[in-house]
Curated annotation (Swiss-Prot):
Location(s), subcellular: Cell inner membrane
Intrachain disulfide bonds: none
Function as written in the Swiss-Prot or TrEMBL entry: Transport of potassium into the cell. Likely operates as a K(+):H(+) symporter.
Source species: Xanthomonas oryzae pv. oryzae (strain KACC10331 / KXO85)
Family: Belongs to the HAK/KUP transporter (TC 2.A.72) family.
InterPro entries reported in the protein's UniProt record: K+_transporter, K_trans_C, K_trans_N, Kup
Protein name from the UniProt record: Probable potassium transport system protein Kup
Membrane-spanning segments: 22-42, 59-79, 111-131, 148-168, 180-200, 216-236, 259-279, 297-317, 349-369, 378-398, 404-424, 428-448
Membrane topology: Multi-pass membrane protein
Keywords (A to Z) from UniProt: Cell inner membrane, Cell membrane, Ion transport, Membrane, Potassium, Potassium transport, Symport, Transmembrane, Transmembrane helix, Transport
The organism's taxonomic lineage, starting at the top: Bacteria, Pseudomonadati, Pseudomonadota, Gammaproteobacteria, Lysobacterales
Gene Ontology terms for molecular function: potassium ion transmembrane transporter activity; symporter activity
Amino acid sequence: MSHTPTPAAGSGHASANSQTALVIGAIGVVFGDIGTSPLYTLKEAFSPHYGLTPDHDTVLGILSLVFWALMLVVTLKYVTVIMRADNDGEGGIMALTALAQRTLPGGSRSMYVVGILGIFGASLFFGDGVITPAISVLSAVEGLQVAAPKLEAFVVPITLVVLGMLFLAQRFGTERVGKAFGPITLVWFFALGAIGVYNMARAPEVLHALNPWWGVLFFVEHNWHAVFVLGAVVLAVTGGEALYADMGHFGAKAIRRSWQFVVLPMLTLTYLGQGALVLRDPSAVSNPFYEAVPEWALYPMIVLATAATVIASQALITGAYSVASQAMQLGYIPRMHIRHTSHSTIGQIYVPAVNWCLLLAVAVAVVGFGDSTSLATAYGVSVTGTMLITTVLMVIYARANPRVPAPLLWLFALVFLAVDCAFFYANIIKFLDGAWFPLLLGLILFTLMRTWRRGRKLLHDEIRKDGIKLDTFLPGLMLAPPVRVPGTAVFLTADPMVVPHALMHNLKHNKVLHERNVFLTVETLQGPYAAAGKRLKIEAIGDEFYRVHVRFGFMETPDVPLALMRSCDQGGIYFDPMDTTYFASRETIVASANRGMPIWRDKLFALMHRNAAPATGFFRIPGNRLVELGAQVEI
């Protein structure tokens, strides 16, 4: 089960306050995306693209499908089942991939396939990260068209300004403004509920939509066309995957309470309220969200909606930084500069490269599609693809759990694979209408991640093939020992059994050895955090030479000097930061058509490797203590 952050010790009242704070915080961060779905879900369902007439039976059928999608996909699948699979308290597709791989034989074909699924799921997440800010903010600003139609020409420019300010502000962090996210989003949800009740009171028969029979009748009446309409229905559950992805920040308990007692009831009320309005006035389908708002509250609602969509976008941008950081740690993407924006919260980071790539892609989406209706056709495919992959990974993970009855597991697999496949199919058939955009983004990212992963393996194999075994090198070196100089030399190496290139270059050109020599290997675990007792492994191999393994979880920021400081506490190596020099190899990649990858992928890997952030910043190594020695490697 998930590890909910422990409240401060004290009275039960303090514990209750802590839980309340977590619930409000979860509402602001976790539910921003799904909370802004009412802006466009019903509008998209009745867009000309689907050819539906907003008559009584059709409206109730769509509302029934929306409500039961929320119940099945979010409440049953994510809240009840998926959130039980935590990786030391962490959730998300990368964490679930690691859990699923643990149940499979190491190095097996199935483990490789699961890794591919995880990479593709993470790639789709970034595609979602482009569409969500674009469609959310654009939908909110489109309220100006309802309030003053003459402002229609200003919708896209205003959207670009809002998004530009949002991305430009990332470098300053969100620690201060983030405290307001929960209360603002809470006001947003209660406003949704109030508007829903206001409209339901005028057409209470809309409550019949809670009966799933209306959803069944919709399928009976519309046959295969109903499956096509699922492409709009799924917009109501976009953001549901955030419940699992953000589990490590707030804990499963707070997220479940937020969903059950605030988010689900308010979403149900607002969808029913929009449906009640359409039952009374079918022309309101042009923008049922804003048409449902009383005229006196329209401008305040536009402001509140814009704030809510900015918060939803912020949560997803922050999530993109987190996934990128995890992917770096797990070796799926090159090292990038990471800036910590908070002195008190380690998880608050800013990744400039990710930020500017997201801004560029979001701006292209806003300008290219132009309105939320067009963007909606592109939206669902990345979300449903991620949801489908999550179900597959969950089945693989749960299959190895003896506490899960086999009939229950296969029932889960049958029901949710069918639901996820139906939603995915309904979106993939919109490929030419816009679904190609997030798929193209996902494919580009998938190619980059696979190329980096494969290239790193080829590079490692090439270095190992040409390398000299440490166990045979050291005895020969001691037969004619070079001059020793005071201090400690730390050689960063991926393979602790082979002599690092940096050591060979140092001996060749400087003809000296340091008093103490450490061969340091940094390992990233499949878990989010490394236990204190397993952080460091020190092996003395004679004559002041040491092998040191430093382990970090994929959620941690590697700090090599700090880890070595702790080696003194363990009684291993004497370590003085001011008397230590770090040596690292900086390989220059030479592409070859006769090796493991096509020449274009070799060149792509060489480009990525050349532009990767140096080890100095990534491992927190002081720049004035680092010596990088070049080596040319052909792959």
